[in-house]
Amino acid sequence: MKLTRRLTLAAFASVLALGTAAPAFSADLIAIITPAHDNPFFKAEAVGAEAKAKELGYDTLVMSHDDDANKQSEVIDTAIGRGAKAIILDNAGADATVAAIKKAKDAGIPSFLIDREINVTGIAVAQIVSNNYQGAQLGAQEFVKLMGEKGNYAELVGREADTNAGIRSQGYHDVIDDYPDLKLVAKQSANWSQTEAYAKMETILQANPDIKGVISGNDTMAMGAIAALQAAGRKDVIVVGFDGSNDVRDSIKAGGIKATVMQPAYAQAQIAVQQADAYIKNKTVPKDEKQLMDCVLINADNADKLETFALKN
């Protein structure tokens, strides 16, 4: 489904620590639900949303669904039971999420989605996501340049249930496939996991010792790939990621991973809370439900400016 609106990216450089749990029932509560916080992208979302909610005077209930649709349903039930005024959600899968959001809507609780869209409109008040296709094309263009437009490469993709995995892969291939001397020799899902990416990269490398590059659907998998390559003494292999994490920033500065694409996790979450606040207070809805935020290429030229999914001035 085509996304129709772009938001201006504001630089949010500082990150506040996660606060304490909300009271059992709060008259002004915003629930913040994301995948597990061991991924720095999802942690930044939660921290950004909580910081903005507290700034606006709300109590917060921060929960994780761990990319499990059943657990997502349970934590949304918790938000409903606590009387949340709004839910900020990075969901556990486009198809599995529709019923959960509808359940919240039927209970009078509006949902504001971040990062991952669903394929249905009119259930969530807003869907604020990165322009994954635009970002993937940026990353692919840099990858082609780094590869010198030729050589064998592998692709690590994310969870199949996550729409972002497919959008990013399509964006990559719509650029790379125009270069016939770039040969895809392996394409495997590592489910956004660093551990899985390490294991998959070991297997790919054994089967394709002449591999020259790896393009990854997120930074966590890119970190797993670079670790496996370095363990095998293959520091010559080009790795490009997607997210803009501090870990990959540091790897770029150290000469490991060559590039990534920053998506504004912290800013997305804060904008979602601002829109939730406007809805709670005035029933104000955004002009467009689906809203895009552009991504930014990060490489050795600007890695110093990257801090927690935002560029410092």
From Swiss-Prot:
InterPro entries: Peripla_BP_I, SBP_2_dom. Residues 1-26 form the signal peptide. This is D-apiose import binding protein. GO terms for molecular function: carbohydrate binding. Disruption phenotype: Disruption of the gene does not affect growth on D-ribose and D-ribulose as a carbon source but decreases growth with D-apiose. Its main location: periplasm. The keyword Signal applies. It is found in: Periplasm. Gene3D superfamilies: 3.40.50.2300. Part of an ABC transporter complex involved in D-apiose import. It comes from Rhizobium rhizogenes (strain K84 / ATCC BAA-868). D-apiofuranose binds at residues 39, 115-116, 162-164, 168, 218, 243, 263. Belongs to the bacterial solute-binding protein 2 family. GO terms for cellular component: periplasmic space. Pfam families: Peripla_BP_4. Keywords: Periplasm, Signal, Sugar transport, Transport.
